[in-house]
């Protein structure tokens, strides 16, 4: 059975449970051609042991074939996660920042952009090490956080950003009880949120590594 995801049309977005209305206050940008806005701060933590979701090798939904998702938020109202092993392309960091409205930067090198999930791929997120923090930063665990604002990219461009980061557009979302049902059917497995795997592992090896460390029982 395919993984249940939320459609991205505006009408349905208005009917989303509160957990997914987080998206409405996160930045809303067109890929490489928009401005970033500041999200509201939240202190909610995932209620699962993860925070990685690892897709079953037999998952029916092609969106999630051999996918590893960092579970950002989960409670009785639903769940939201960002895929960490689906690279799209590399872009010059200075060019990306300039198109997002940042000026007078000394940025060099490229930044790899990832597909965070099939829902609303025009919404951006930066998953990063917890050495960087702004008022809008969401702590995922003691070592990993998420920030969605133009400021973090400006800081990255000026070498004032986090030591480790991953830029993704889009997300995976579940309504109330959907993720729990898929975990029971073993559509997904839980694995510990390993810092090195999230930021340093070869992306081609992330799924295999996470799957080999999956938890068989919740």
What are these regions (language model features)?
Residues 6-23:
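Bacterial N-terminal signal peptides that target proteins for export
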Residues 21-33:
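Bacterial N-terminal signal peptides
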Residues 36-218:
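A short aromatic-anchored loop/beta-hairpin motif
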């Amino acid at each position: 059975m395919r993984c249940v995801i939320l459609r991205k049309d505006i009408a349905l977005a208005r009917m989303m449970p509160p957990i997914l209305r987080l998206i409405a206050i996160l930045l809303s940008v067109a890929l490489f051609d928009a401005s970033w806005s500041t999200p509201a701060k939240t202190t909610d933590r995932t209620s699962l042991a993860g925070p990685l979701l690892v897709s079953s090798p037999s998952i029916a939904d092609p969106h999630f074939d051999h996918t590893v998702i960092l579970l950002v938020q989960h409670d009785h109202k639903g769940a939201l996660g960002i895929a960490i092993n689906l690279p799209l392309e590399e872009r010059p960091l200075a060019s990306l920042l300039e198109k997002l409205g940042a000026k007078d930067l000394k940025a060099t090198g490229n930044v790899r952009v990832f597909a965070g999930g099939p829902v609303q791929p025009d919404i951006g997120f930066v998953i990063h090490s917890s050495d960087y923090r702004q008022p809008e930063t969401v702590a995922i665990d003691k070592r990993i956080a998420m920030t969605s604002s133009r400021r973090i990219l400006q800081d990255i461009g000026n070498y004032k950003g986090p030591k480790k980061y991953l830029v993704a557009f889009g997300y995976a979302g579940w309504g109330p009880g959907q993720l729990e049902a898929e975990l029971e059917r073993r559509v997904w497995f839980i694995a510990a949120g390993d810092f090195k795997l999230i930021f340093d592992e070869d992306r081609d090896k992330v799924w295999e590594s996470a799957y080999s460390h999956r938890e068989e029982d919740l």
